[in-house]
Amino acid sequence: STRVRSSAASDVYKRQVVGFGKLIAWGEKCLNAGRARVWKGGMMSVALIVGVYFFTFLFFKVIGEYSIILTALIQTLLIFCCLAGTTLIREVRMVFEAVDRSLDEGRKQVARIVGRDTSALSAQEVRTAALETLAENLSDGVIAPLFWYAVLGVPGMMAYKMVNTLDSMIGYRNERYRQFGCIAARIDDVANYIPA
């Protein structure tokens, strides 16, 4: 059934993001201290992105020697997992359904996908916030992954997801990440420039 396939793909996507997140968190814990934080953060970011690309490339090269069908199945699953648009569309639909039931439910639901205070939003503002989030994330979740798939295949798409995860974890301008995450944030800007 479609629901079972979608659930399996969702589980793979969550594991992938958690795996990327653990690598980034470990690297940040080891390297984000002392001097040369910009250099250390940049080297970690580049190493993770290039590492994911080559690991994926070599993985499919080895698997492809044994089974073209298995290769195609795994690639299809990864492509589906990397496209986060369906999850976000579902979340936006849930916001619309919640706000139709009650304004308070709508505010709570939209708070899950926006990064601002939703307690004073009107019903129309709740819907607008959900749609704005969908539009903003369409590039990161659908357009850019497809672009990098077209340019560099599944390894490129996976490397892009690492770029995106790095930016979402360390690409902030606060005291902790201003230096360490600045190169990750710039790489994300470059990776999204053409697709956006």
Q: Where do the PLM segments sit?
A:
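Central hydrophobic cores of alpha-helical transmembrane segments in multi-pass inner-membrane proteins
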Residues: 20-29, 53-56
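"…together with the soluble PPM/PP2C metallo-phosphatase catalytic core" -> "…together
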Residues: 36-169, 174-189, 193-196
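Interfacial/capping segments of alpha-helical transmembrane domains
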Residues: 11-19, 66
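Single conserved hydrophobic/aromatic residue that forms the stacking wall/gate
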Residues: 2-9, 13
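A residue-level signal for conserved active-site and pocket-lining positions in enzyme catalytic cores
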Residues: 1, 27, 106
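Non-catalytic, topology-defining segments of multipass membrane proteins
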Residues: 31-34
